């Protein structure tokens, strides 16, 4: 807990916010994966969804189940992405645009999608101009990069995943209190923690609740695991923690259904 005390002390002194906005944006996105006709498998579980996974990550957590994916891919112009959405037709009935208009969620994930937030904002603005609507958009965020004011109106749900020491990354890289506090002030913001031991709740309290960074009612606990076996192994510990502390539980439904298959 000594490292935890040092982190909290640093937050009281005003931890430095990391700036990832120096890269010039363009009319393209660096994309690692695009797939549709699936469901949101964690946090906001169960909604039909199309996933747009952007390249790159600021952390590279030890338990990440997508690091082999977000390191791959390439640059796509907005026009190419729109064409893909208009043509992509898994069920051979409706394309992605019509499904999004009908209520399917667009989940923007990574890696760290806010690494490209300037280009992402331009993409969403052009989407709105082209199709005359904005879908229900969920976006993943590690609470390291603060979103721009201009991006906020486009996002219906912030799926935040602040970290714990179990990510096995140096703590100063993932504990940015000013960003966490800003995200907690958004009404559509939830905080998902990955759990693999009973000690994890003590860390959540020490790092996030006692300093007043987030609200307990917006906490979601999810078992660690990138295979069905690992998720089941950690589920009971996580559920017991949820019951004991009166917070929400999220499974990893895509892992439960399809194990470690990608693109689902």
Regions found by a protein language model. Name each.
Residues 2-24, 29-39, 48-49, 55-157:
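Conserved Radical SAM active-site core
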Residues 43-45:
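A short catalytic or substrate-binding loop motif that flags glycine-/basic-rich loops and adjacent residues
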Residues 114-264:
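Conserved AdoMet/S-adenosylmethionine-binding subsite of the radical SAM
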């Amino acid at each position: 807990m000594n490292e935890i005390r040092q982190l909290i002390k640093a937050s009281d002194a005003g931890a430095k916010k990391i700036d990832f906005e120096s890269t010039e944006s363009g009319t393209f996105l660096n994309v690692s994966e695009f797939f549709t006709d699936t469901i949101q498998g964690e946090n906001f579980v169960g909604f039909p969804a199309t996933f747009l996974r952007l390249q790159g990550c600021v952390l590279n957590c030890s338990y990440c189940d997508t690091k082999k994916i977000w390191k791959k891919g390439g640059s796509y112009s907005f026009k190419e992405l729109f064409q893909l959405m208009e043509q992509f037709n898994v069920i051979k009935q409706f394309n992605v645009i019509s499904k999004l208009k009908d209520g399917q969620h667009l989940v923007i994930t990574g890696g760290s999608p806010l690494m490209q937030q300037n280009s992402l904002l331009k993409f969403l603005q052009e989407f709105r101009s082209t199709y005359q609507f904005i879908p229900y958009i969920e976006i993943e965020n590690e609470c390291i990069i603060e979103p721009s004011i201009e991006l906020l109106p486009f996002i219906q749900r912030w799926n935040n995943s602040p970290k714990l020491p179990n990510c096995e990354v140096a703590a100063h890289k993932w504990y940015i209190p000013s960003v966490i506090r800003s995200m907690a002030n958004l009404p559509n913001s939830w905080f998902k923690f990955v759990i693999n031991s009973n000690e994890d709740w003590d860390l959540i309290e020490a790092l996030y609740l006692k300093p007043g960074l987030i609200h307990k009612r917006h906490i979601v606990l999810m078992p660690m695991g990138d295979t069905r076996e690992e998720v089941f192994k950690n589920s009971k510990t996580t559920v017991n923690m949820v019951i004991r502390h009166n917070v929400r539980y999220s499974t990893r439904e895509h892992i439960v259904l399809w194990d470690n298959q990608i693109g689902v």
